[in-house]
């Protein structure tokens, strides 16, 4: 039983979302459709956006690989160019975000990653300082820290649902 697993299929834990196989059940944390929504929301709040950088940790690049196809489709349909902005250390954030600010029409998508969550206050303050509109993946953390806009699954609700699954499993019931 997993409450929130980033990519159960890509991680080899489940055969598919509809039919995971084996003795596993739970809730996936990644939904590729979110990538397209991040692009469209950012374009809606910053209509002059023509360039988006995807801020990601190359050590755990699976979120970038997971979301990139849908982000590229959405960006292309809105006339937006996409680039990757890898951040390996805390010091990399300033150069990545200030680099986006060097020309007009820039925006930033902060990709799902624990490294980005841990450094959210720095990321949010740099985006504000350099006036780069940014959208963040984890609503509870980034919204409470002052992020411009967030859009993600409701992780708290997923944990509540997982608790219900665990209760049923421990009582001998099925999760379907």
Question: Residue locations for each model-derived region?
Answer:
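Short hydrophobic alpha-helices and adjacent helix-cap/hinge residues
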Residues: 1-176
